[in-house]
């Protein structure tokens, strides 16, 4: 729909491999593996995922996008990830479970998709990058979704308004419109540098839960949040050399 509305041209052949990485990493692999893992893991493990993902994104930014972060950047990224992981493990009692393997694989796939999409957005644009990746994944997802809807028809019929509202939000914003801004930011600021913003996400989620749901906001959460924000701010000042932008053909 968006591609037709904008009359976007077909992507060049050289864009197919990065688009496939986005499709496999961000559209199929990451949501599928995390949904499997979080069935048996406590919610705090989701913060572990977010804590590892920025560092993994920086690694793939170096591998796929040709970026060269300085030693200072790697130190700040590692410290930030360690803070978030330590906070999450402290909330969950410090235990790891077999389903954490799915979390680890999800992190690798998402980091690959972020880096490939961020690099591609420099020439294709953030909107076209996610739209073409969604279209590329459609032949795999449509039959699978149709089969799942047929299998779970009674559950779908019994789902309430809150469930459908959450599903619509994730579908429209998290998996579509959000990527417009995410890939645009990576195209402007670089994969490694912009990816570090994810470190603040767990604490913003806890703040939102406190404001919207009335959940208690403990003082260790505030301390960790301030420390992570300070690390992200310091990391933004560290040098990251970016590869020259080459047009796709």
Model-derived segments and their meaning:
Residues 23-28, 32, 55-59, 85, ...:
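Hydrophobic/small/kink-forming positions within alpha-helical transmembrane segments
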Residues 22, 60, 69-91, 108-110, ...:
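Hydrophobic transmembrane alpha-helices of multi-pass small-molecule transport proteins
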Residues 3-4, 57-58, 77, 94-152, ...:
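Transmembrane alpha-helical segments that form core, pore/gating elements
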Residues 37, 63-65, 69, 120, ...:
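Hydrophobic/aromatic residues within transmembrane alpha-helices
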């Amino acid at each position: 729909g968006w591609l037709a509305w904008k009359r976007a041209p077909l992507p060049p052949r050289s864009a197919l491999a990065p688009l496939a990485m986005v499709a496999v990493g961000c559209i199929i692999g990451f949501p599928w593996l995390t949904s499997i893992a979080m069935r048996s893991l406590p919610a705090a493990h989701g913060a572990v995922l977010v804590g590892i993902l920025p560092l993994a994104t920086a690694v793939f930014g170096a591998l796929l996008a040709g970026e060269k972060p300085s030693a200072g950047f790697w130190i700040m990224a590692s410290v930030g990830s360690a803070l978030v992981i330590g906070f999450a493990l402290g909330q969950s009692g410090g235990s790891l479970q077999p389903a954490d393997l799915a979390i680890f694989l999800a992190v690798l796939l998402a980091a690959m998709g972020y880096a490939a999409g961020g690099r591609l957005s420099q020439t294709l644009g953030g909107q076209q990058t996610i739209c073409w990746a969604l279209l590329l994944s459609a032949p795999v997802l449509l039959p699978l979704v149709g089969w799942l809807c047929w299998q779970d028809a009674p559950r779908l019929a019994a789902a309430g308004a809150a469930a459908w509202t959450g599903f619509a939000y994730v579908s429209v914003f998290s998996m579509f419109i959000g990527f417009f801004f995410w890939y645009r930011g990576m195209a402007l600021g670089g994969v490694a540098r912009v990816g570090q913003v994810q470190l603040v996400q767990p604490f913003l989620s806890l703040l939102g839960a406190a404001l919207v749901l009335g959940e208690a906001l403990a003082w260790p959460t505030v301390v960790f949040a301030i420390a992570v924000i300070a690390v992200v701010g310091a990391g933004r000042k560290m040098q990251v050399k970016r590869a020259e932008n080459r047009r796709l053909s």
